Amino acid sequence: MALMTWTAAEFGTNVGFADDQHKTIFDMVNKLHDTAATGNRSEIGKQLDALIDYVVMHFKSEETEMQKKGYADFAAHKAEHDKLVGVCADLQKKFHAGEAEVNQDTTRFVRDWLVNHIPKVDKLYGPCLSA
């Protein structure tokens, strides 16, 4: 069963590239959530790395568009991105050093961040970036 499901009503920003990337992130988190239940560290590590790489790329895409369009809340938005990237990088480093686990609690943390960030923060850039 999926940990999270993207719907336009709940998560749509009306910015095509962002919505498409959010859907991919949801799919990747769901896959990592299912794999985390198996305890297969090798596969978990591969999926964790792919997810973090994709999220970093996504954040850069959003930030580039925000700067191009002169989005007023760019600095605060980027600060939220930077904070999550820092948490993820620390987890990634510790996981690969054998000092941390990635389990379903981890994926629920990511879900909770996304289901708060997208509707409350990302949706605010919709009018600016889609103009």
From Swiss-Prot:
Fe cation 1 binds at residues 22, 58, 62, 122. Gene3D superfamilies: Hemerythrin-like. Keywords: Iron, Metal-binding, Oxygen transport, Transport. SUPFAM superfamilies: Hemerythrin-like. InterPro entries: Haemerythrin_Fe_BS, Hemerythrin, Hemerythrin-like, Hemerythrin-like_sf, Hemerythrin_metal-bd. Fe cation 2 binds at residues 62, 77, 81, 117, 122. Pfam families: Hemerythrin. GO terms for molecular function: metal ion binding; oxygen carrier activity. It comes from the Bacteria. NCBIfam families: bact_hemeryth, hemeryth_dom. Oxygen-binding protein. May be involved in a storage mechanism or for delivery to oxygen-requiring enzymes. The oxygen-binding site contains two iron atoms. Monomer. Belongs to the hemerythrin family. PANTHER family: BACTERIOHEMERYTHRIN. This is Bacteriohemerythrin.
